[in-house]
Amino acid sequence: MENNIRLGKISAVDYAAGTVRVVYHEKDDAVTAPIPLISSEYFMPEVDDMVMVLHLSNGTEAGVVLGRPWSEKNKPPEGSKGLYRKELARSPGEAMIRYKDGTMTIKAAKLVIDGTVTVSGDVTAGGVSLDNHTHTDSMGGGTSGPS
């Protein structure tokens, strides 16, 4: 049962099958058979990413990738108590969901919502409040806010 949990590096990725091969440099560069990741989400690691693997036997044939530990290459993008942050792209902050202290932030280059959107509070876009904005009338004067 020695060395059933190991750190290794991804040597190959099969995106369609959702499996990877892991190389163990400290084990004479032994490479696993294709093994799956434990995840219900799809975000595959890349070649050379460090991963933690649970082996179900003494060999390298049966195992599962438990995840990517924080490392010099994979640092937390930020950290504080009560923070939830899910990165959705390889570069931190490029595409993510963040929640802290009652505020949720969704960030992406483009956001597509396929369905009806209902908002119960004010909507602000480009610094303009939908509830409290005014327009200039045809005579150059201001109008009252929306009613």
Residue ranges and their predicted role:
Residues 3, 43, 58, 110, ...:
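Short, flexible coil/turn micro-motifs enriched in small/turn-prone residues
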Residues 97-98, 103-129, 133-135:
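Low-complexity, small-hydrophobic/phenylalanine-enriched stretches
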Residues 131-147:
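Protruding loop/beta-arch "assembly-hinge" segments enriched in small, turn-prone residues
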